[in-house]
């Protein structure tokens, strides 16, 4: 214990954030030096009295015999103590704040996954809400840092903690809280370094959540911009993160450009192939029934990942392809009845009403995916002689 305390004092006195983050790690797998001993005894050995409550809270958080709820409370108390001392510290303290907030969220996430009892799970959720307020306090300390030197300012931790809060809020299913945090940061962006100057690991997470939130708000164009940015910022070896980004970007990219992933993408990310390939193949064939079956098989995933709305929007493209096949089968006739479309839908095993088909055609016309108009008296779609299906004609 004496060696451990001596190392703690050295890291605190020399303001060595990375070393202190290692010494105050609350994961025994990454910090075998953390002593399972009396918290007060360890804290009493810290020469800087301001740090004594931090060290005491750290030792208490390392207690493996506590329940998941108690562990979460202890880790929250540890971060709260770090926030207290961070008020008068500069950029050097960020590594330990990063580590503490990440582990706090990890404790909560694992508890939610492992606990089956509904009442116990609700207690964890309530505690996580409290934890999110502590992390929000950490973000506020970064945003409001008035250090005269920007290089030594805690502002460099801003986007990391925005990402941490978004992860917590999504875990709690409170996406509006994520939007509120992002609005606050955007309103203060003039006082922050440019986004591009932050570590890519921070901006990648930020861009990803901006993209997901845009998609949930049905702003597909903004979703494409942010998710593409996140993919470009993602570390090339972080294939799991790339896969998560692409899980959202693939439907967005199709909605915006009609593009589907290349063979190389499918080979690199076989799980994405499992999720999307059957669905996209059916879409490109105009096979409504197979498309619906593929979506139904993955419905729980799409709902969980906030993708269901985007996938439902893709269904319009299946009918567009089906209508195009009818157009070609009729030698590119400029007049096609709604009954013809309904008969084609029945051929692929889908029973839809004439009203639904008219609404689908109207939607295609509105979005410039079909050139023409509907003659409602004759229940006929009148197509332009040239370029009736501009997107599909171009692709062909």
Swiss-Prot record:
SMART domains: PAM. Signal peptide: none annotated. Transmembrane segments: none annotated. It comes from the Eukaryota. Residues 204-388 form the PCI domain. GO terms for molecular function: double-stranded DNA binding; RNA binding. Pfam families: PCI. PANTHER family: PCI DOMAIN-CONTAINING PROTEIN 2, UNCHARACTERIZED PROTEASOME COMPONENT REGION PCI-CONTAINING. Belongs to the CSN12 family. This is Protein CSN12 homolog.
